Regions:
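Acidic/histidine-rich alpha-helical segments that form the ligand environment
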Residues: 119-157, 171-178
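Low-complexity, intrinsically disordered or signal/transmembrane-proximal segments
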Residues: 22-23, 29
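Short, contiguous alpha-helical
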Residues: 28-41, 48-119, 159-201
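Ala/Thr-enriched low-complexity intrinsically disordered regions
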Residues: 3, 9, 17, 24-25
């Protein structure tokens, strides 16, 4: 055959593995299966779907890496800044809430900074990984609904959430969220390698 190894994505469909994907599958031996990387050559229906595809991918990588960590590592910090992996998960869900619902759509949000306490990320002792993953998935669905109901050029609603900068276009908000996820999932790659030798892409 000419297609080489095949990687199976989380919902059961498969795709031929490029050399880069084959390598990634080997080095991520400890990770749970996550969505395939949204390669630039893959056709999409719109520019908005490009952003949504990257956000879906980074969320899936985040969750698979967290689920692959030994349980004690979720609330352990391995870096001088002091954050823990489970705190990172809660932070990213709230980041989407802040940017897309509170700022862009101008919705009233009871606690837009709900992951923050005394200037640092916080997860209560009773909050579990399963609950926070479910919250992330629920937020992802709401985020997609916001994006699909607007054009990328639409401007956010005026409000206090923007500080002094003023509202931004949806496209700029999505670009910010993609870089935020990419940066933090890269941070989690480092923490995972320190915790159990799991090597990221």
């Amino acid at each position: 055959g000419g297609t080489g190894p095949v990687l199976v994505a989380g919902d059961g469909w498969s795709l031929p593995a490029s050399p880069r994907r084959q390598h990634a599958a080997v080095v991520r031996h400890a990770s749970r299966v996550s969505l395939p990387f949204p390669e630039p050559a893959i056709a999409v229906s719109s520019r908005a779907e490009v952003f949504l595809g990257y956000l879906d991918y980074f969320r899936s990588r985040l969750v698979s890496k967290l689920e692959a960590l030994p349980g004690g590592e979720l609330r352990r910090s391995r870096l001088p800044s002091g954050w823990t992996p489970i705190e990172l998960l809660k932070h990213l869900a709230h980041d989407e809430l802040r940017w897309l619902e509170w700022r862009f759509e101008g919705r009233p949000v009871a606690d837009p900074w709900g992951e923050d306490r005394d200037g640092r990320w916080y997860v209560a002792p009773g909050e579990t990984l399963e609950e926070l993953v479910a919250a992330l998935h629920a937020q992802a669905a709401r985020s997609r609904a916001v994006v699909e109901s607007h054009d990328l050029a639409d401007m956010g609603q005026p409000g206090d959430g923007w500080d002094t900068a003023g509202p931004a276009a949806l496209e700029r908000v999505l670009l910010h969220l993609v870089q935020e996820y990419a940066r933090h999932v890269g941070h989690l790659d480092i923490v995972s390698e320190l915790a159990d030798g799991q090597i990221g892409e």
